[in-house]
From Swiss-Prot:
PANTHER family found in the cross-reference section: ACETATE KINASE (PTHR21060), ACETATE KINASE-RELATED (PTHR21060:SF15)
Protein name per the record: Acetate kinase
Cellular component terms per the entry's GO annotation: cytoplasm
Active site location: D154
Keyword Metal-binding in record: yes
Residues that coordinate or bind substrate: R97
Organism name: Synechococcus sp. (strain JA-3-3Ab) (Cyanobacteria bacterium Yellowstone A-Prime)
């Protein structure tokens, strides 16, 4: 049952084609694509790979109109030399990562005109993600008419959080208008919880976990029995941890102060989302790899950015712990969580009193889907590879089998 997956962002797109999807085994995609729209002002950098092989360049597109200009990339799935499919009709479903589903959607959903309209109406809450997802939905409807498309929402996993975790201490009338904490990265938080249960050899229903999705966007989730009971992101993906270019949580009084000084809303939005976090503090980059290299060279602001990132990460791990009765495992995932050993080491330093103790050799050894704790640590520390595309394909398959 070939399933095509799209994961669209404001400046990039990732796509995977799965020939088959096993519900409990992560499957290597038949085909993958990465598109970087920010590569050059007038050109998108496109790479593809087949069956987990090396990445190869795909003919660059001059001045593409975003995702809507990528028809030739998707047509290469069934046209031309080396295409993995004989015909477009072999594709049985298309899955889309949709970042914000509000309180409307608690599970993967077949995309209808009504669902599409709802995604559009929620775009102001995820302006970097919902509009590109809509572009992908509309492009593939043109290329592959009649093939079911499924929205898998990043917010869905968190929609059953207790009211005390989901609401803000604001006038209750605001909550009635939909202003509440939705949470994000739910696709990967849920995947990490299920994978942690497999690694630990224990039923998910009995586990209490903190999952750390650390990439350019960062969030934590407290998970009890497979259900999210708290998370760090809120009404938008701006709340919570310090991130690559996002500030995370700050005193709202600062924003009021800047508005009174004459800063307009658009400028404030740009600074908080694109010019803060690691980027804003270091003045160098939003990429943790660049920060770590600069620290080695003695760059003071890179070190400050790293220390701020770790301080806020540890603080929020503590906050998530308060929503649990105990902690069975701390899970690291995402680009930083999986690849930055110094971040994991600093986050777990001196946490022996909580039962957290990592093995420095295991931590430094590029771990994937494994336990990096010392043998006698009561709380296990896991590194789990983010597999959002596979999780989306799996969700599509389950939904279509139920229909």
């Amino acid at each position: 049952m070939p399933i095509l997956v799209l994961n669209a962002g404001s400046s990039s797109l990732k796509s995977s084609l799965f020939a088959t999807v096993e519900s409990t085994v992560e499957t290597t995609p038949l085909w993958q694509a990465q598109v970087d729209f920010a590569y050059q002002p007038d050109q998108a950098l496109i790479q593809v790979r087949r069956q987990g092989g090396p990445w190869e360049p795909f003919p660059a597109l001059s001045s593409p109109s975003g995702i809507s200009g990528l028809a030739s990339l998707f047509q290469s799935l069934w046209q031309g030399e080396g295409s993995p499919l004989a015909t477009a009709a072999e594709i049985k479903a298309i899955g889309h990562r949709v970042v914000h589903g509000g309180s409307l959607y608690r599970q993967p959903t077949l995309i209808t005109p009504e669902v599409e309209q709802a995604i559009e109406q929620l775009s102001p809450l995820a302006p970097a993600h919902n509009p590109p997802a809509l572009e992908g939905i509309r492009l593939l409807r043109q290329l592959l008419p009649g093939i079911p498309q499924v929205a898998v929402f990043d917010t869905a996993f968190h929609q059953q959080m207790p009211a005390a975790a989901a609401l803000y201490p604001l006038p209750y009338a605001w909550a009635e208008q939909g202003i509440r904490r939705y949470g994000f990265h739910g696709i990967n938080h849920e995947h990490c919880a299920r994978r942690a249960a497999e690694i630990l050899g224990r039923p998910l229903e009995e586990l209490q976990l903190i999952t750390c999705h650390l990439g350019n966007g960062c969030s934590l989730a407290a998970i009890r029995g497979g259900h999210s009971v708290d998370t760090t992101m809120g009404y938008t993906p701006l709340e919570g941890l310090m991130m690559g270019s996002r500030s995370g949580s700050v005193d709202p009084g600062i924003l009021i102060h800047q508005l009174r000084r004459g800063m307009d809303v658009e400028e404030l939005d740009r600074i908080l989302n694109r010019e803060s976090g690691l980027q804003g503090v270091s003045g160098l980059s939003s990429d943790m790899r660049v920060i770590l290299e600069a620290m080695q060279a003695g760059h003071a602001r890179a070190e400050l950015a790293f220390n701020l990132f770790i301080h806020r990460l540890r603080s929020q791990i503590g906050a998530m712990l308060m929503s649990l009765d105990r902690l069975d495992a701390l899970v690291f995932s995402g680009g930083i969580g999986e690849n930055a050993a110094p971040v994991r080491a600093a986050a777990c330093a001196n946490l022996g009193f909580l039962g957290i103790q990592i093995d420095p050799v295991l931590n430094a050894g590029s771990p994937r889907n494994c336990d990096i704790s010392t043998s006698d640590a009561p709380v296990r520390v896991l590194v789990i590879s983010a597999q959002e595309d596979w999780a989306i394909a799996n969700a599509c398959q389950k939904l279509l089998q139920e229909e």
